[in-house]
Amino acid sequence: MDLSRIPPQPKAGILNVLIEIPAGSKNKYEFDKDLNAFALDRVLYSSVQYPYDYGFVPITNNLADDGDPLDGMVIMVPPTFPGVATARPIGMLQMVDGGDRDEKFLCVPAKDPRYTYVKSANDLAGHRLDEIFEFFRSYKNLFKKPTEFFGWKGDVAGLPLVEECVKNYYKTYCKNDHGK
């Protein structure tokens, strides 16, 4: 699978999120570049499970310099399977995970008319945001990895981050004019 062929933003205000983990799973899969496949990274051995579909935005390299792409959670019912979800970001959870900056985009499916009214994370029922926050607050407790939170940002605040992370990806991995 050549992930470099999947654009991070097919059009303004839309992200491609490559789903690695369906909602309800306790198994954390990550795309392994060497295997060119999804591989089991670890099992969440606490009582938590992923509340919504989870994956990453291709051709991005986050600014924490850990080599990981930007993360995205897509509120999709029912859960899907690994593949590309065209999604509209409605917010971004700002956090530090294990000492590294680690933003999480919160998205809704771009092609689901049930979410046309949702323009920001604040348009969701408060319980949904609490559920997502609680998942990220506790999912690494038994791994003894601390997490810190700095709150939610609206969708407009997150999109410049995507552009920065695309540039960082090309600068890190391609060493050509794309990163300028």
UniProtKB/Swiss-Prot annotation:
GO terms for molecular function: inorganic diphosphate phosphatase activity; magnesium ion binding. Substrate binds at residues 28, 42, 54, 139. One of its GO terms (cellular component) is cytoplasm. It catalyses: diphosphate + H2O = 2 phosphate + H(+). It holds the Pfam family Pyrophosphatase. Keywords: Cytoplasm, Hydrolase, Magnesium, Metal-binding. It is found in: Cytoplasm. Mg(2+) 1 binds at residues 66, 71, 102. Mg(2+) 2 binds at residue 71. Its EC number is 3.6.1.1. InterPro entries: Pyrophosphatase, Pyrophosphatase_sf. Its main location: cytoplasm. Hydrolyzes PPi generated in anabolic reactions. Catalyzes the hydrolysis of inorganic pyrophosphate (PPi) forming two phosphate ions. Belongs to the PPase family. Homohexamer. This is Inorganic pyrophosphatase. The gene is ppa.
